[in-house]
Amino acid sequence: MAVHLPSYADYMVASEELEPSLGWSYDGWLGDLAANPEMKSADIAVSMVDRYMEACLSNNPNDYLSLSVIDLSVVPTLLRQVETYSAYLTEALENGQLPTISRARQRMYPFGKFADSSTDMVDFMAFLDATRQFAPNMASQIESTYRTAIHYSLGTDMFDYLTGMSILVPGSNVSEFITSFDEQYDCGEKYPNYSQFTYGY
């Protein structure tokens, strides 16, 4: 989603994990804004994350929670780098590395799994660390850019990886994914190389 927003906003506030039924604490961050109408957009976004976590933890301290602030000005650079990286991953698939990548994917936590509602979204760094062997220098560049893009991030200690942004990596139901991707989610014009990798995988 973040790749579609840089023309429209400075920051994106989003959760990697499913959000609880409690939802966002609007009175919290709106109260902060009312008390300080001169707040910068980045500070408003951080307040959203803080107030969300406070409200959700108060409701259930053992919940699966995450919320991040993404600096959208960095996302176009990140996208270009991921596109280059994806070409290396497709080459790895063509060279017989499907079993390696598939095993790595099965070890990743798909967000929503705790509620049996997985959407094949995994943590960005979990994906990068699992595949960096195929293009280590490019992976290091991506990691540096990614760390810059994550302006702020909070979450509970329920995850092996929770670094601020998720990425779609199809799991066991690849054929089902391809059908739904074609019909509903294909935005390949934004990231053709990554789309090619997911189809090939």
Cite the ranges covered by each PLM segment.
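Terminal, contiguous helix-loop blocks that mediate binding/assembly
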Residues: 1-201
